[in-house]
Amino acid sequence: MILSALGSCQKDVILEDNTESGITHDSLIQLLDAEWKFKAPEYSDDVFYALNNWEEWRMMINNLEKKPAKSISAYQKKVSDLLNQIESLPETLPEGFQNQAILSRINLLKTHAPTLDMLLELNPIPYKETLPYFNLIQKDIRSIANQFQEVITKKNIPIESGEEQVRISVDTVRRAQINAIPTE
């Protein structure tokens, strides 16, 4: 009797039919498998070379492209691994890509991935709420890739003569002096 009590304390994924929503676990796994269609974003050659040494991004994309084994626990583990990889992205951004537009898109990805993780941990899994998050994560990744392209495009625009002087004269924050405001 004690052995059975100890054995039942383990946290196992219980595969029961989702009778509330009328869907079996086999059907749920088929739905998850059909929605897991992550693809690496298309890059220009300039972006590809700029991101070539960013190991965390490449590992995350490679991990997403591989479908998990056909079990709920495999999907849960895959999304949990994805969360860990996403957390390291802002700290490891390559030089030149550390701007607010890219960071905000990474933060959006950091919002959608934990929500997907939470939904996959529920029992029964609310598949109608879960499935849209696969598309949202793919859109977030595409949006980040588009921002990479925009950064490279802006960097390649040549500066015209006198443009730097205009920027400096217009930028009042740079011209402001600490002692300019009188103190009384």
Regions found by a protein language model. Give the residues of each.
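Immediate post-signal-peptide N-terminus of mature secreted/exported proteins
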Residues: 11-77
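Short, solvent-exposed, charged loop/turn and helix-capping segments
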Residues: 88-103, 120-127
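C-terminal amphipathic alpha-helix
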Residues: 27-43, 47, 124-184
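C-terminal motif of bacterial Sec signal peptides marking the signal peptidase cleavage site
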Residues: 4-8
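Short, charged, amphipathic alpha-helical segments
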Residues: 76-80, 100-107, 128-136
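Amphipathic, soluble alpha-helical interaction motifs
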Residues: 63, 85-88, 92, 119, ...
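Charged, amphipathic alpha-helical oligomerization/scaffolding segments
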Residues: 52, 56-59, 81-84, 88, ...
